C-alpha cells in the first residue's frame, strides 16, 4: 500500500503514454483489420473467405443494415455501406501486417437490446507469425513513415480528447443550471399563484432594490443562479468534513434534548439551595471566608515585616554603570519565576543541589513575602507547598524545599551545585537578566565583602531580585538581592549561603590554612579566632547555628559547641595547636608538623645505633586539668578566667620569640665505656658477607690465588639533628644517646678493627 501513496512520477507517466501510443500505432486500429478478401473483420458483418487469421472463429451476429463499432469518430453507429467504403480506401492497406493480423481485437456483438464486448486472446503461434512477418516486411522507409504519421496525429488526438472533455463538462453544467433554473421558475410560479398580492409586493421591492443598488442586486442574482456549482465545489472539497459536522451536530442535539430534563432538575435544585442559604443567613452576622482572611493576614504580615526592617531592600539602577551584554540563554531549569496571586512578576528563584542529593530553591526573603506561585518550565506550584530549610534574616536569604513527591518534575527544574560563602572569590561572575522576553548575560564583578554579603558591580533593574551569579562551571555562587542604601555603597549587593553541616556543606570538619585560602583569593575565609565580628543566627530544620562574620572572617558553630569553645578559652575549633585540645580531630597533614623538604633531608642522614636502655628516663608529663565550664564556675573563678583570657589575648597580639631548646645532659664515662664494650662485642660476632672480600685466604675454595685486602677506616659522619659531638674513639668523649630517627640500616661501630669501604 505504501507504493500507492507515493507521488506520481511525471517521467513514468510520459514513458507509459509513449509506449501505449506506439503499441496502438504499430498494431491495426479498431475497425481496420482486413481479411484476405478485403472485407473488414472488425465490422462483424462479412464472412471469412480463406486465409489464416485470428478472427476466423469470432462470432459475428450483427444486423445487416446497422452495426455499432468502436470508432474514434464523433458517431458510434455506421452502416455496412460506410464500412465497405472505408475498407476500400487506400489509407487502410499498409502491408501484409494489417491484412494478416494475428492480434485479437474487440468484437462488438450487436443486438436490438444491448451490445456486448467480447475479447479473445491470441495464441503463441499467431503472435510468432505476426512478429516474423513484421521483421520480414518492415523496412526503414515504412518505420519512418509510421513515426511521421504518429507525430502528425498526436496533437490532433490530444486536442480531440480535450474537446470531448470540455463538451462533457459543459453538458453537465448546462444540465445542472437548466434544472436549477426550472426549479426556481416553478417555485416563483407557485408563489405567484398561491399569494399573488405578496408576490407583487416582493417584485416591487426587488425592482426598487435593483434600481437603487444595481451591482449588488445583479451579483446576488448570479450567486443564486450559480448556487449548484458552488455547492458542488464545496462538497468536493469538504464533503467528509461536512458529513462529520452534520453527524456531530445531530449527536449534540440528541444528547441535549435527552439530558434536558436532568439538567433542568439540577438547575432548579441549585437555585433552591442557594435561596435557602440566603434566607438562613439573613438573620446571622456576615462571615468572611477563610481564604480572604488568610490573604489579609498575609498582607498585614508582609507590611509589618517591611516596616520592621532596618535596611529596606531597594531596587534601582546604578548610575554611570555601562556593562556590555550578550544575547545568551541561562542554564535551563535553574532560574524560576515568582509571581503573586494576580500573575504579576515579583522576582526570581534558583534551583540548587544541597548535600546528600537534596534539591532546594534559593531566593531572597523579600521576594518570598510577596510570592504566591513559583513558575518553572513545565508548570507552577504554590508557595504554601514549600517549607524552609535555611533562613538568615540579616542576609535576606532563604532555602526552601517541598515534601510533595515529584515537585521537581512538576516545575521542570534542573538544579546546579551550590557554592558556599567561604569559596567566593573577588572576580567576575556571569549574571543573566531578562529584557523584553530575551535573556542577556553580563559580567558582574564582585569587588569587596561587606556585612556578610558582597558588593557587586552589575546593571540591574527593579524586579531582578533573586537572579543567581554563576561561575565558569555554571555553579550558583551568590544571589542578587537589590542595591545597597545610597548613603552606604553605590553598588549592588548579593548574598551567599553559609556552610551548614549536612545541608550546604559536608559534615566532616575541614581545617584550612594560609596554603589553601588567603585574602587575595577568597572574599571570606574560615576564622581561627571568632571573638570579634557580627553575630548572625542561622535557623535550619531542627537546629540553629551562630555565625560570627568580620571583615574577612566567617566562623560557623552550633549553639552547644559555641558554649563549649567559649568555656575553654580564646582558642577555637580551628586553632593551630591541636595537642592542647584532644577533642578536636587531628590534622590531615596541613599544619605545624607537616613534612617539609628540610625535615625529609634531615631524616635521610644516618645516625649511630644506640641502646635505648642507656637513654635518660623521660621527664614526667604534667596531667591535664579539665577546664571547668563557665556555668559551673564561682564568681571568683569567673574573674580569674576573665583575667586569664585577657592575658592570653594580649600575649597573642604581641609577637613572642620561640623558647630555646635545652641541651640534653651529657652521659657519664661509665655509661660510655659500657656502651663501647657492647658495640665491640657486637662487631666481633658479625660474620662477613659473601659478596664482599674476606680477610681470610681461601685454602680449598674456588679462588686459591686471592689475597686479603686491607680496609681503610672511614671518618664518622656528623649528625645534623643534634649539636652533640659524634662518637669517634675511646677517649671518653660525649655521644648521642637519643632515639632513632629513621629505619635505615645503621653503621655499626668497630673499635680497633679496620673496615673496607662499601661499594655503592
Swiss-Prot record:
Domain Peptidase S39: 318-515
Signal peptide: 1-33
GO cellular component, one term: membrane
Family to which the UniProt record says this protein belongs: Belongs to the peptidase S39B family.
Function according to Swiss-Prot or TrEMBL: Precursor from which the VPg molecule is probably released at the onset of the RNA synthesis. Essential for virus replication.
Taxonomic path: Viruses, Riboviria, Orthornavirae, Pisuviricota, Pisoniviricetes
InterPro entries: Luteovirus_Orf2, Peptidase_S39B_luteovirus
Subcellular localization: Membrane
Source domain of life: Viruses
One GO-annotated biological process of the protein: proteolysis
Name of the molecule in the record: Protein P1
Membrane topology: Multi-pass membrane protein
Domain topic, free-text comment: The C-terminus part of protein P1 and P1-C25 displays RNA-binding properties.
Membrane-crossing segments per the record: 172-192, 194-214, 218-235, 240-260
Organism of origin: Pea enation mosaic virus-1 (strain WSG)
Keyword Membrane: yes
Annotated site location: Cleavage: 315-316, 515-516, 543-544
